[in-house]
Regions:
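Intrinsically disordered, low-complexity, positively biased terminal segments
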Residues: 1-3, 10, 56-58, 62-64, ...
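Active-site rim helix/loop that mediates acceptor-substrate recognition in acyltransferases
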Residues: 17-58, 62-70, 173-193, 197
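Conserved catalytic-core motifs of GNAT/GCN5-like acyltransferases
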Residues: 78, 113-119, 135-148, 263-275
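Active-site acidic-Proline motif in GNAT/NAT acetyltransferases
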Residues: 75, 88-90, 94, 221
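Surface-exposed beta-loop interaction hotspot
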Residues: 140-166
């Protein structure tokens, strides 16, 4: 059967959301991991948000007039981010995923780089991305739990303010070589970003500490990263934190485990194009 790749339309949104839910639920269940979405409706809401966002390039795969998959390219900043890419479970292993990936790679070929994060237990997607030029850069774990405790002397943690964005951009440039302010500014309104302030300076930020997929964080030091996470935890009541943590950052990993976080699943950061080993302390989002 032939497969056509085209731009997503409004009438595709519900189908794409249901496919997204079933695809992630199927692969997670096969490996005894919890699903990424609590319901089909949650995945449909994500599909609608991505389609409506002018800074996200959204495409579908269509076969015999039926939508069988979709993919997205986030275009907020210099580095592009892929995902989610999902294929109807009954239509997988037919080359559709490769075509969807080739389309977003072509779209992002003029950018500094393209990155993604995949479930480490999904051997099929790992092989596909590697064959398309993506290199494994970082082993990750998704963590969830409650971190609470006394902040180090002289550090304040509070919600982000307009005047903090320039400092956050500088933190990102120092850590990664590029900034992510457009992404930080355009988070959904129901998510709150936070900063840690020491000596009148912003020394850390975390963009969505209660929603791991959209959370990215950078800090001058591991102490500042621990402070911003603990400070957010203290402000969060019973709401748990969730984030992706690079497991090579062994001290931060052990600190997180000691302070109430638990590992939910392993993931892998992959990159195509420009990449520099991060400096300081950082947490990636599901994009990069």
């Amino acid at each position: 059967m032939s497969v056509e790749i085209r731009l997503m339309r409004q009438e595709d949104v519900e189908t794409c959301g249901r496919i997204c839910y079933e695809a992630f639920k199927t692969i997670a269940g096969r490996h005894n991991f919890p699903p990424d979405f609590p319901s089909p409706e949650a995945a449909i809401q994500l599909s609608q948000a991505l389609f409506a966002n002018p800074q996200v390039f959204s495409i579908v795969a269509e076969s015999d007039g039926q939508v069988v998959g979709s993919n997205h390219l986030w275009e907020y900043d210099a580095i592009r981010a892929v995902g989610p890419i999902t294929i109807n479970p009954g239509f997988q292993s037919k080359g559709t995923g490769r075509k969807l990936m080739e389309a977003v790679i072509e779209r992002g070929q003029a950018s500094a780089g393209i990155r993604l994060v995949q479930d480490s237990f999904n051997a099929t997607s790992l092989a596909l991305y590697a064959s398309l030029g993506f290199d494994v850069k970082e082993p990750l774990v998704m963590m969830e739990g409650a971190i609470k405790g006394e902040l180090p002397s002289g550090i304040e943690v509070r919600p982000i303010q307009e005047e903090d964005f320039a400092a956050c951009a500088e933190l990102s440039r120092t850590a990664h070589g590029f900034e992510r302010v457009n992404e930080l500014r355009n988070l959904p309104p129901f998510l709150t970003s936070y900063v840690a302030v020491r000596g009148g300076r912003v020394t850390a930020y975390t963009s969505a500490p209660h929603f791991w997929a959209l959370n990215q964080a950078v800090a001058e030091s591991e102490e500042d990263m621990q402070a911003v996470l603990m400070g957010v935890g203290n402000l969060s009541g019973e709401q748990p934190l969730s984030f992706l943590l690079p497991t090579r950052r062994t001290d931060l990993f052990r600190w997180s485990l000691k302070n109430g976080m638990r590992v939910i699943k392993p993931m892998t950061l992959m990159a195509r194009g420009e990449y520099r080993e991060p400096r300081g302390s950082y947490l990636p989002s599901v994009g990069y």
